Amino acid sequence: MENIIEVRNLKYKYDSESENYTLNDVSFQVKKGEWLSIVGHNGSGKSTTVRLIDGLLEAESGDIIISGDKLTAENVWEKRRQIGMVFQNPDNQFVGATVEDDVAFGLENQGLDYDLMVERVQQALELVGMQDFKEREPARLSGGQKQRVAVAGVVALRPDIIILDEATSMLDPEGRLDLIQTVKKIKDSNQLTVISITHDLDEIALSDRVLVMKEGQVESTATPRELFSREDLEELGLDQPFVNQVKVALRQSGLSLPDSYLTEKELQDQLWALLSKM
């Protein structure tokens, strides 16, 4: 599968006088159509990385290649049309008086034909299940509903890449799971690429690959299963998955279990298999 993003030897620091780099020689690739989660402690460089990809920041050195083209000052606005970004706090993204006005805002800036714009807004709201709230004021929505509208605003623009910058971190567990399942459905049905900065284990479990960042560098890449089998998850700013906690407790009780489980269902199946042999 071809790469839609290539990051090569990226360096960046917020203070030009400082000797300390926020990002120091960061390189990785994102394949077209994949879901890449980026994890690491606060300050590891995750958000800085995606802001550089989106052209919100300019690297001191290194290259960012998007769909075969090097990101430059001359083409940054063109490349931004390929990328939609959803941030942590949806209130900071709302500009419209109603939900449908807000989703239409980016399309208006692109000078889209009115009838096509109405069609795109309706389709986007239907995809995130918010069509019945189109005339509602954004301020009157729940946190999860606000993030759904933020996703709709991105989807309406028809990007190739969606970046979630801790977009689920302010939601309750049910709202987080609901939102990431919505994004996955949209990704799969439209063959989109998703980059997700997250500490949420359910979100990580849905991804194809995980990029682990530490102190401004890429520490490793792994599948979710490989990541969850690590014993130093807390050092990466992640909780131990529930299935890992259960596995440790069962091993301490004398049960022999495989090293990794990605879901509770896998653990249940293994336990049933063990019980059937007793």
Curated annotation (Swiss-Prot):
Chain positions recorded as ATP binding sites: G40, H41, N42, G43, S44, G45, K46, S47
Residue ranges occupied by any ABC transporter domain in the UniProt entry: 5-240
Keyword line: ATP-binding, Cell membrane, Membrane, Nucleotide-binding, Translocase, Transport
GO MF annotation, one: ATPase-coupled transmembrane transporter activity
Transmembrane helix is among the record's keywords: no
This protein's GO CC annotations: ATP-binding cassette (ABC) transporter complex
Enzyme Commission code(s) on record: 7.-.-.-
Keyword Translocase listed: yes
Highest taxon listed in the record's lineage: Bacteria
Pfam families: ABC_tran
PROSITE patterns: ABC_TRANSPORTER_1 (PS00211), ABC_TRANSPORTER_2 (PS50893), CBIO (PS51246)
Span of the signal peptide: none
Cellular localization per UniProt: Cell membrane
Topology relative to the membrane: Peripheral membrane protein
NCBIfam families named among the record's database cross-references: ECF_ATPase_1, PRK13635.1, PRK13648.1
Family: Belongs to the ABC transporter superfamily. Energy-coupling factor EcfA family.
Primary role: ATP-binding (A) component of a common energy-coupling factor (ECF) ABC-transporter complex. Unlike classic ABC transporters this ECF transporter provides the energy necessary to transport a number of different substrates.
Subunit structure: Forms a stable energy-coupling factor (ECF) transporter complex composed of 2 membrane-embedded substrate-binding proteins (S component), 2 ATP-binding proteins (A component) and 2 transmembrane proteins (T component).
Protein name (record): Energy-coupling factor transporter ATP-binding protein EcfA1
Organism whose genome encodes this protein: Streptococcus sanguinis (strain SK36)
